[in-house]
Amino acid sequence: MGQKVNPNGIRLGYIRDWRSTWYADSSRYATKLNEDIKVREFLHKKLAAAAVSKIQIERPAQNAKITIHTARPGIVIGKKGEDVEKLRAEVHKLMGIPVQINIEEVRKPEIDAKLVAESVAQQLEKRVMFRRAMKKAMQAAMKSGAKGIKIMVSGRLGGAEIARSEWARDGRVPLQTFRADVDYATAEALTTYGVIGVKVWIYKGEILPGQIAEKKNNKKGAK
Protein backbone atom coordinates (compact mmCIF):
# COMPACT_ATOMS: atom_id res chain seq x y z
CA MET A 1 0.00 0.00 0.00
CA GLY A 2 1.47 3.36 -1.05
CA GLN A 3 2.17 6.05 1.53
CA LYS A 4 1.80 9.74 0.72
CA VAL A 5 4.67 12.00 1.74
CA ASN A 6 4.08 15.68 2.60
CA PRO A 7 4.04 17.47 -0.81
CA ASN A 8 5.69 20.60 0.67
CA GLY A 9 8.54 18.75 2.42
CA ILE A 10 9.51 16.64 -0.59
CA ARG A 11 9.86 19.76 -2.79
CA LEU A 12 12.05 21.74 -0.35
CA GLY A 13 15.24 22.94 -1.99
CA TYR A 14 13.89 22.14 -5.44
CA ILE A 15 10.85 24.34 -6.15
CA ARG A 16 10.03 25.25 -2.51
CA ASP A 17 12.01 27.44 -0.13
CA TRP A 18 12.27 27.02 3.64
CA ARG A 19 10.00 29.17 5.82
CA SER A 20 12.78 29.77 8.34
CA THR A 21 16.08 30.88 6.81
CA TRP A 22 18.92 31.23 9.31
CA TYR A 23 22.00 29.40 10.55
CA ALA A 24 22.76 28.38 14.14
CA ASP A 25 25.35 26.11 15.72
CA SER A 26 24.21 23.03 17.68
CA SER A 27 24.14 24.86 21.05
CA ARG A 28 21.70 27.56 19.82
CA TYR A 29 19.70 25.64 17.21
CA ALA A 30 16.97 24.25 19.52
CA THR A 31 16.45 27.66 21.20
CA LYS A 32 16.00 29.46 17.87
CA LEU A 33 13.70 26.73 16.53
CA ASN A 34 11.49 26.98 19.64
CA GLU A 35 11.40 30.78 19.24
CA ASP A 36 10.21 30.37 15.63
CA ILE A 37 7.45 27.93 16.69
CA LYS A 38 6.27 30.26 19.49
CA VAL A 39 6.29 33.32 17.19
CA ARG A 40 4.27 31.49 14.52
CA GLU A 41 1.75 30.21 17.10
CA PHE A 42 1.41 33.71 18.58
CA LEU A 43 0.93 35.40 15.18
CA HIS A 44 -1.59 32.83 13.90
CA LYS A 45 -3.60 33.22 17.13
CA LYS A 46 -3.35 37.03 17.17
CA LEU A 47 -4.19 37.38 13.46
CA ALA A 48 -6.88 34.69 13.28
CA ALA A 49 -9.26 37.09 11.47
CA ALA A 50 -6.63 38.27 8.97
CA ALA A 51 -6.52 35.10 6.79
CA VAL A 52 -2.77 34.46 7.27
CA SER A 53 -1.38 32.01 4.71
CA LYS A 54 2.24 31.66 5.85
CA ILE A 55 4.89 33.34 8.00
CA GLN A 56 8.53 33.51 6.87
CA ILE A 57 11.30 34.19 9.39
CA GLU A 58 14.82 35.38 8.53
CA ARG A 59 17.58 36.21 11.01
CA PRO A 60 20.22 38.50 9.48
CA ALA A 61 22.95 39.21 12.12
CA GLN A 62 21.29 39.98 15.50
CA ASN A 63 17.92 40.93 14.01
CA ALA A 64 14.76 39.18 12.84
CA LYS A 65 12.85 39.85 9.64
CA ILE A 66 9.31 38.43 9.59
CA THR A 67 7.18 38.37 6.43
CA ILE A 68 3.45 37.77 6.94
CA HIS A 69 1.52 36.60 3.86
CA THR A 70 -2.13 37.56 4.34
CA ALA A 71 -5.30 37.95 2.26
CA ARG A 72 -6.40 40.90 4.45
CA PRO A 73 -3.39 43.21 4.94
CA GLY A 74 -5.58 46.07 6.22
CA ILE A 75 -6.47 44.09 9.37
CA VAL A 76 -2.78 43.41 10.14
CA ILE A 77 -1.58 46.98 9.45
CA GLY A 78 -4.46 48.84 11.17
CA LYS A 79 -5.04 52.61 11.08
CA LYS A 80 -1.84 54.44 10.10
CA GLY A 81 0.17 51.28 10.85
CA GLU A 82 -0.67 51.28 14.58
CA ASP A 83 -1.54 47.57 14.78
CA VAL A 84 1.62 46.41 13.02
CA GLU A 85 3.73 48.52 15.42
CA LYS A 86 2.02 46.90 18.44
CA LEU A 87 2.61 43.52 16.85
CA ARG A 88 6.30 44.31 16.29
CA ALA A 89 6.71 45.27 19.97
CA GLU A 90 5.03 42.04 21.14
CA VAL A 91 7.18 39.86 18.86
CA HIS A 92 10.29 41.77 20.04
CA LYS A 93 9.40 40.74 23.62
CA LEU A 94 9.11 37.09 22.54
CA MET A 95 12.39 37.02 20.60
CA GLY A 96 14.46 39.52 22.56
CA ILE A 97 16.04 41.02 19.40
CA PRO A 98 15.08 43.91 17.04
CA VAL A 99 12.25 42.80 14.75
CA GLN A 100 11.17 44.04 11.32
CA ILE A 101 7.69 43.01 10.11
CA ASN A 102 6.77 43.05 6.42
CA ILE A 103 3.27 42.41 5.07
CA GLU A 104 2.69 40.70 1.72
CA GLU A 105 -0.79 40.42 0.23
CA VAL A 106 -2.05 37.06 -1.06
CA ARG A 107 -3.59 38.12 -4.39
CA LYS A 108 -5.59 34.93 -5.01
CA PRO A 109 -6.76 33.39 -1.70
CA GLU A 110 -8.94 30.92 -3.68
CA ILE A 111 -5.80 29.03 -4.80
CA ASP A 112 -3.89 29.22 -1.50
CA ALA A 113 -4.15 25.77 0.15
CA LYS A 114 -3.92 27.08 3.74
CA LEU A 115 -6.68 29.67 3.25
CA VAL A 116 -8.91 27.18 1.40
CA ALA A 117 -8.47 24.58 4.18
CA GLU A 118 -9.32 27.16 6.87
CA SER A 119 -12.34 28.37 4.88
CA VAL A 120 -13.72 24.79 4.60
CA ALA A 121 -13.04 24.21 8.33
CA GLN A 122 -14.91 27.42 9.27
CA GLN A 123 -17.90 26.35 7.15
CA LEU A 124 -17.97 22.93 8.84
CA GLU A 125 -18.00 24.67 12.24
CA LYS A 126 -21.04 26.64 11.05
CA ARG A 127 -22.81 23.32 10.24
CA VAL A 128 -22.58 23.71 6.46
CA MET A 129 -22.77 20.28 4.75
CA PHE A 130 -19.24 19.05 4.02
CA ARG A 131 -19.98 18.18 0.36
CA ARG A 132 -21.35 21.67 -0.28
CA ALA A 133 -18.31 23.31 1.38
CA MET A 134 -15.89 21.16 -0.66
CA LYS A 135 -17.72 21.78 -3.96
CA LYS A 136 -17.84 25.56 -3.40
CA ALA A 137 -14.08 25.70 -2.61
CA MET A 138 -13.19 23.59 -5.66
CA GLN A 139 -15.29 25.69 -8.04
CA ALA A 140 -13.72 28.94 -6.74
CA ALA A 141 -10.18 27.50 -7.10
CA MET A 142 -10.72 26.28 -10.68
CA LYS A 143 -12.25 29.67 -11.65
CA SER A 144 -9.18 31.45 -10.20
CA GLY A 145 -6.74 29.52 -12.39
CA ALA A 146 -5.88 26.31 -10.50
CA LYS A 147 -5.03 23.31 -12.73
CA GLY A 148 -6.44 20.89 -10.16
CA ILE A 149 -7.62 20.63 -6.55
CA LYS A 150 -8.25 17.80 -4.12
CA ILE A 151 -9.97 18.19 -0.72
CA MET A 152 -10.27 15.50 1.95
CA VAL A 153 -12.29 15.70 5.17
CA SER A 154 -12.02 13.13 7.98
CA GLY A 155 -14.01 12.66 11.19
CA ARG A 156 -17.61 12.32 12.33
CA LEU A 157 -19.04 13.85 9.17
CA GLY A 158 -22.60 15.11 9.57
CA GLY A 159 -22.60 13.87 13.18
CA ALA A 160 -22.30 10.19 12.14
CA GLU A 161 -21.54 7.63 14.88
CA ILE A 162 -18.57 6.19 12.97
CA ALA A 163 -15.78 8.48 11.72
CA ARG A 164 -14.87 8.25 8.04
CA SER A 165 -12.98 10.05 5.30
CA GLU A 166 -14.50 11.64 2.19
CA TRP A 167 -12.63 13.33 -0.65
CA ALA A 168 -13.34 15.13 -3.91
CA ARG A 169 -11.11 16.18 -6.79
CA ASP A 170 -11.40 18.49 -9.78
CA GLY A 171 -8.74 18.60 -12.50
CA ARG A 172 -5.42 16.81 -11.97
CA VAL A 173 -3.12 16.79 -8.92
CA PRO A 174 0.24 15.07 -9.75
CA LEU A 175 1.88 14.19 -6.42
CA GLN A 176 4.96 12.37 -7.80
CA THR A 177 6.19 15.06 -10.22
CA PHE A 178 8.75 17.17 -8.32
CA ARG A 179 8.46 20.16 -10.67
CA ALA A 180 4.66 20.22 -10.18
CA ASP A 181 3.73 23.25 -8.06
CA VAL A 182 1.42 21.51 -5.57
CA ASP A 183 0.38 23.61 -2.57
CA TYR A 184 -0.66 21.51 0.45
CA ALA A 185 -2.16 22.50 3.81
CA THR A 186 -4.28 21.15 6.66
CA ALA A 187 -6.82 22.66 9.06
CA GLU A 188 -9.09 21.46 11.87
CA ALA A 189 -12.80 22.14 12.36
CA LEU A 190 -13.83 22.03 16.04
CA THR A 191 -17.45 20.85 15.85
CA THR A 192 -19.86 19.73 18.60
CA TYR A 193 -19.31 16.12 17.42
CA GLY A 194 -15.52 16.36 17.66
CA VAL A 195 -12.61 17.42 15.49
CA ILE A 196 -12.90 17.16 11.69
CA GLY A 197 -9.61 17.25 9.79
CA VAL A 198 -9.36 19.05 6.44
CA LYS A 199 -6.58 18.46 3.88
CA VAL A 200 -6.19 20.47 0.67
CA TRP A 201 -3.93 19.91 -2.36
CA ILE A 202 -3.89 22.59 -5.10
CA TYR A 203 -1.99 22.09 -8.37
CA LYS A 204 -0.98 25.38 -10.02
CA GLY A 205 1.11 24.12 -12.95
CA GLU A 206 4.75 23.15 -13.46
CA ILE A 207 7.82 25.14 -12.41
CA LEU A 208 10.75 24.44 -14.75
CA PRO A 209 14.44 24.59 -13.60
CA GLY A 210 15.04 27.84 -15.56
CA GLN A 211 12.14 29.52 -13.77
CA ILE A 212 13.50 28.39 -10.36
CA ALA A 213 16.94 29.96 -11.05
CA GLU A 214 15.26 33.17 -12.27
CA LYS A 215 13.13 33.31 -9.11
CA LYS A 216 16.23 32.91 -6.87
CA ASN A 217 18.13 35.63 -8.78
CA ASN A 218 15.18 38.03 -8.46
CA LYS A 219 15.13 37.35 -4.71
CA LYS A 220 18.86 38.14 -4.38
CA GLY A 221 18.41 41.32 -6.43
CA ALA A 222 15.56 42.45 -4.16
CA LYS A 223 17.75 42.07 -1.07
Swiss-Prot record:
- Give the CC-aspect GO terms: cytosolic small ribosomal subunit
- What range(s) does the KH type-2 domain occupy? 39-107
**Subunit and partners:** Part of the 30S ribosomal subunit. Forms a tight complex with proteins S10 and S14.
Q: Name one GO molecular function term.
A: structural constituent of ribosome
Question: PANTHER family given for it?
Answer: 30S/40S RIBOSOMAL PROTEIN S3, SMALL RIBOSOMAL SUBUNIT PROTEIN US3C
Q: Which UniProt keywords apply?
A: Ribonucleoprotein, Ribosomal protein, RNA-binding, rRNA-binding
Question: Which HAMAP family did the record assign?
Answer: Ribosomal_uS3_B
Tell me the protein's name: Small ribosomal subunit protein uS3
Gene name per UniProt = rpsC
| Source organism phylogeny | Bacteria, Pseudomonadati, Pseudomonadota, Gammaproteobacteria, Thiotrichales
Q: Where is the signal peptide?
A: none
Write out the GO biological process terms: translation
The record's Pfam families line, in alphabetical order, gives: KH_2, Ribosomal_S3_C
UniProt entry tagged with the keyword Cell inner membrane = no
Return the similarity comment.
Answer: Belongs to the universal ribosomal protein uS3 family.
